[in-house]
Amino acid sequence: MPKIIEIPGRSGFYLRVAVPRGKLRDAFGTCDVVKKIGNTKEEAEENISSAEIAIQQKFDEKLREEDAKQINKSLPKGIRLEAIKNSNSKEPPKNIEKDLKDAGFSNAAIEALMNFDEKESTNIEEIEQTVPSPCIANNSPRAKFEQFKADSNYLNEPLHSELLNDSDHFTNDAVQLLKFHGSYQQDDREHRKRGGTGKDWQMMLRLRNPAGYVPGPLFVALDELSDRLGNQTLRATTRQCFQMHGIKKGNIKEVIGTIVKSMGSTLAACGDVNRNVMAPAAPYEQGSYPAARKLANDIADVLSPQKAEKTYIDLWVDGEMKYAIKPSSEVKKNRKLQLKPGVFSGDKKEPLYGATYLPRKFKCATTVPGDNSVDILTHDIGLVTFTNKKGVLEGCNVYVGGGMGRTHNLDTTFARIADPIGYVEGEHILELVQSILALQRDYGDRKTRRHSRLKYVLHDMGVDWFKKQLTSKYFTRQIENLKHEGDTILEDYLGWHQQSEKLWFVGLPLLSGRLTGRVKKELRNIVEKFALDVRLTPNQDLLLCNIGNYQKASVKRALINICLLYTSPSPRDQL
């Protein structure tokens, strides 16, 4: 049985695929049960799937009921003839599984159909109450951009072809793919104000810097690239990563390639994937801070697209795979879990995301109890880490569904703080994170991008529905009650702080995250001279890290010379 149900739901007519309730939840969730095929009966009949046609056209419309019953006995278990039309043949249909697959049903749905017990089928009203916005899980119509992503050969074309031509800009199609590689195309309108004609095309490039970490050699490379091939500035963002501006199309490959070869990456810094993972910028070497930073790095790697990374390496460093992500043992182990039912996208090349990736961007952050510098409730996933006395991760409080974005004068978009869902043991955290992402992949709105973030799934369907879907289909580990976190503060880390017994870090304020002119040049000199690393904060400030006890006075003098520290410092600057 697929068939047209001639009783309308609240919003149209459906192709009904009845599946036993228990098997349904285990295999693929409720949304494959009903496939909407029209708002009216006439529209539904015009959109009958190839599977229905293949089954129904083999039967005579006037076939007697007794003959239909006899034919049903020869059909595969779970398929029942209920609509008969358009054929004089009385032979039972063949290749039903292939017909269903051609019609767009998932393997899990087909398997469940073959084992269907009609007595356990659910009804249309129950199903409608469990169907969220248009999404992969309910086979709803999707925006054209979703098909464009699927046709891009894992974010490759037409970007690859257009990198080779002499145009001064990318087409809109290539620009959409360029985002996944960390870049946006922009028009410098100031060019026309200065008397120029036409559009002055240039690229903005965003890096991926988990926990805000920028190794010294990468900072030096960024400074040189921004001066030579950019607009002579760098900008720290509120997601703890650097941006470069003013890059011409003809230079974009050299810029990204140099970044990759200098310990950096721009992969997944933009686009419908997991973005830069945040964590407290302070490089403290005690307490839960090291575990929170490591977890941020592991999340960034485990949620990185895999086949798209191969595309990225091919495009920007000519396929030199030595520059690919070097995942930790925990990441390697959890990547294997991306092939398990529920989490698996159905695409072995891109097991977590699939060829259409996510409906929209996805954001994660980690922190420690008492430190809310990353604003933990404003992310799709927020994790508060708990460690033992040796600093080993024991588990995390988990929050989901936050996000501050909204569209002006559009009430259907809104900011939302994340909901707590419980505490999960540390050894299962990466599995949990990729399970939540898979749920958003399946249930996020694929038709209306302004309504596509995880926060709208939580708002529309509720926390109880979310937890039920998560634990029945994607993540079968135990979720415990939240642990007490204590009071929190919003730390900015400006001034001098002791990093460890022999090391210091100093927080430097930047105006709107902008680095330019003499300050940028001298910071580069300080980083090179003293072999320091850089970390970026959610306040768009900059930390110089790993300053030895014997280096502190010299670094302090150099910073005073460029007015980033003062001769009459605050009490903590006098440390």
Q: What residues fall within each predicted segment?
A:
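N-terminal basic/disordered segments at the start of proteins
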Residues: 132-203, 213-215
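Short amphipathic alpha-helix segments
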Residues: 213-228, 513-529, 555-556
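Mobile "lid/hinge" segments at catalytic clefts and subdomain interfaces of large enzymes
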Residues: 353, 358-455
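Terminal amphipathic helices with adjacent charged low-complexity linkers/tails
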Residues: 441-497, 551, 555
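Single conserved hydrophobic/aromatic residue that forms the stacking wall/gate
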Residues: 566-575
